[in-house]
């Protein structure tokens, strides 16, 4: 939770506080007990009424559900921060550094958040990254401003071509 919050805080430049909590419907009982208790009723209904599929992840912006109260940009920032925390977890617990794919993530985000994300992932902590975006000029300006090494490719009609320095 703290890693996720630190990523969100960096991207939003400390403008918002977020939280993430897990709410289990099992409460104090074990999952096995919960499933045993609801088995007869589940058979009658034809589907499971209780279990981990009914648990909730409460995604908060301040004290409110981000899904209802947050803007599209705040929701997108939340998702990106969650994915970056997931990347960090996989990197720390695995034997190899995972690839990071940011597929058209800049849609719905203002320029300052996009720049913060690029600064964050351009550091040494993220390894190899693939970024896709439909707004070339937007991405070019930010990559130039950040000053990190990168290669750019054009994908057109199924063909992948590396762009020359002068094309960027």
Describe the residue ranges of each PLM region:
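Conserved NTPase motor "head" modules and their coupling/switch loops across ABC/AAA+ ATPases, GTPases
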Residues: 1-99, 108, 112, 116-128, ...
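Walker B catalytic acidic pair
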Residues: 103-105
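H-loop (His-switch) motif in ABC-type P-loop NTPases
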Residues: 132-134
């Amino acid at each position: 939770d703290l890693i996720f919050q630190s990523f969100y805080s960096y991207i939003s430049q400390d403008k918002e506080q977020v939280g993430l909590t897990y709410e289990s419907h099992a409460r104090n009982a074990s999952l096995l007990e919960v499933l045993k208790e609801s088995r007869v009723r589940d058979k009658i209904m034809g589907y499971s009424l209780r279990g981990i599929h009914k648990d909730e992840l409460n995604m908060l912006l301040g004290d409110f559900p981000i899904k209802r109260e947050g803007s599209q940009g705040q929701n997108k920032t939340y998702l990106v921060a969650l994915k970056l925390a997931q990347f960090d977890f996989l990197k720390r617990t695995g034997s190899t550094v995972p690839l990071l794919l940011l597929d058209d993530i800049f849609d719905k985000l203002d320029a300052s958040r996009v720049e913060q994300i690029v600064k964050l992932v351009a550091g040494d902590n993220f390894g190899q990254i693939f970024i896709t975006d439909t707004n070339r000029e937007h991405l070019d300006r930010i990559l130039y401003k950040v000053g990190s090494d990168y290669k750019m490719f054009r994908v057109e009609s199924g063909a992948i071509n590396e762009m020359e320095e002068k094309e960027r």
